[in-house]
Every structure is written in structure tokens, then in C-alpha cells.
Design a protein with these regions (language model features):
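Hydrophobic-face positions in mid-chain alpha helices that act as interaction patches
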Residues: 4-125, 130-131, 137-193, 198-199
Length: 203
């Protein structure tokens, strides 16, 4: 708690998306994102291997998350639908796939690998205030940081502006929740933000 208090007091942490730490890739041959490279090598650049999972999609769908079309590509009929563990992708006799694949946007050649982001910082600070670690517990402050963190995440993925406004308006007000309920909402947004970074999401 003392170390966290010191960090919060010193205010030397990143304060905008300009401080994001990323490993950069490019469209130059040999320097593409490895996730793109897997698809280019094995499936002709079309993602028929990696699909949306309900453990991320359902919490996003609950609040009409504006990142859905940035995270996932719709099925052949234009509908977003995810899979459960070990569930096969849904297709038809013509080979059209109806399950939502992880988006070509996330698997583009020059998609950077995020090491640490502004939205992570804000959501962690939100958790600090919700728990009262090194600071006075303050769910109103936690909610302010929560909203800012989710907004920053939507901005990072270039989600639609109007859809993001609607999404943010649907999120619960943490100040009206119990501590455990507030922490659940914060953790769920951390989980969603780390969807493309599974090691961090599980730590």
C-alpha cells in the first residue's frame, strides 16, 4: 500500500496515450506482426483459425461495447456471434463462416504489440480507489477513472465515436455499487482490454 501511495502521490505515471509502450511492426516484409504472419503462411491471410469467445464477447455485448466491430469481424450474414470453449465454428455447405473471427484489424500487418497503455493505467488507478489501497476509498473517483479508462480504450481501437458515447452511458455508475460489484466491473473492463494479450489478462 505504501508503494502504491507513493506512486499515486508522485504522479509520474503515464498521463495520455502518447505514453503508451508498444512494440512496433510495419508492412515491410519480414517486419510484420507475427499474428498476421501466421495467417499469411497458413490460411492465405484470411482468418479461419481464431474466433471470438463468449467469455469476452458476452460482457461486451451486455453494454453494446463500441469495440466489438474493432475486435471481431461479423459472420457471413453480418451478425456478431462468438463461440464457447471447444465449440466448432458455424458454417454452411458453401463454406461460409457464420462465427465471428478475431478481426482483420487486430491481425493487420502493422498492428503493434501493446506492452503497457494509458487505459491500463486509468483502470488500475480506478481499482486503487475502489479498494482504497494507499488512498482513501472513493467509488466516485473510481468511477471517474473507470469511465476515462474505457474511453481511452475505445479511442485506442478507433471505435465509432457515437457508439462509444452510447456504450459509456450504459456502463454502471461505480459510486452506486458495492465495492465488490465495482471491482467486478473494473476487472471485466481490464479483461476485455487485454483480450489480445492473454498472458497479461490471466495475471
Amino acid at each position: 500500500a505504501d508503494d502504491i501511495k507513493k506512486m499515486m502521490d508522485e504522479k509520474k505515471m503515464i498521463t495520455s496515450a502518447a505514453g503508451n509502450m508498444e512494440f512496433q511492426y510495419s508492412e515491410t516484409a519480414g517486419n510484420e506482426n507475427p499474428k498476421y504472419g501466421i495467417l499469411a503462411k497458413y490460411t492465405g491471410g484470411i482468418n479461419t483459425m481464431f474466433f471470438a469467445h463468449n467469455n469476452v464477447f458476452k460482457p461486451m455485448e451486455k453494454y453494446a461495447d463500441s469495440r466489438i466491430p474493432r475486435y471481431f469481424d461479423p459472420g457471413h450474414d453480418g451478425v456478431f456471434r462468438a463461440l464457447d470453449t471447444r465449440q466448432d465454428a458455424e458454417d454452411d455447405e458453401d463454406g461460409n463462416i457464420y462465427s465471428s473471427a478475431i478481426s482483420s484489424y487486430l491481425y493487420r500487418k502493422d498492428c503493434p504489440d501493446v506492452l503497457y497503455s494509458y487505459q491500463e493505467q486509468l483502470l488500475l488507478e480506478s481499482e486503487v480507489y475502489a479498494r482504497g489501497i494507499g488512498v482513501t476509498k472513493d467509488l466516485a473517483k473510481a468511477n471517474e477513472l473507470f469511465q476515462a479508462g474505457v474511453q481511452a480504450a475505445c479511442n485506442y481501437y478507433k471505435a465509432d465515436t457515437e457508439a462509444t458515447k452510447t456504450f459509456l452511458s450504459k456502463l454502471p455508475d461505480l459510486s452506486k455499487l458495492s465495492e465488490s460489484e465495482a471491482l467486478y466491473e473494473i476487472h471485466m473492463q481490464q479483461w476485455i482490454d487485454l483480450m489480445d494479450r492473454p498472458l497479461e489478462a490471466f495475471v
